[in-house]
Curated annotation (Swiss-Prot):
UniProt cross-references to PANTHER family, sorted A to Z: TRANSCRIPTIONAL REGULATOR, ARSR FAMILY, TRANSCRIPTIONAL REGULATORY PROTEIN
Domain of life: Bacteria
GO biological process terms held by the UniProt record: regulation of DNA-templated transcription
Pfam family, one: HTH_5
Gene: yczG
Protein known as: Uncharacterized HTH-type transcriptional regulator YczG
């Protein structure tokens, strides 16, 4: 089984985080992760994209350090790394989450 790696808090790069947040679908996923403890691809039913596309976007969020994944059996549970993001980039996540969707 491929165990995903997560960047350490000290190695998070602002350019990678901002790139990950620049996509409207990933921004929506971040908002959903902020509202829920964990999400899986199947619990994002309101997002109208293929499962492979959704998996790709979660991978970008994970590799940038925004999200982390916990594997249990065949399921992958994603969660927001809010504390790590706040430590690395104070105020960034709060600012992003408070932007109206019509301004994305």
């Amino acid at each position: 089984m491929n165990i995903p790696n997560h960047p350490e808090t000290e190695t998070l790069q602002l350019t990678k985080v901002l790139h990950a947040l620049s996509d409207p679908l990933r921004l929506e996923l971040v908002k959903q992760l902020a509202e829920a403890k964990e999400k899986t691809c199947s619990t994002c039913a309101d997002v109208q994209v293929a499962k492979s596309t959704l998996s790709h976007h979660f991978k970008v969020l994970r590799e940038s350090g925004i999200a982390q994944v916990r594997i249990e059996g065949k399921r992958r549970y994603y969660s927001l790394r809010a504390e790590d993001l706040e430590k690395a980039f104070p105020g960034l996540l709060e600012a992003v989450l408070n932007v109206d969707q019509d301004r994305w």
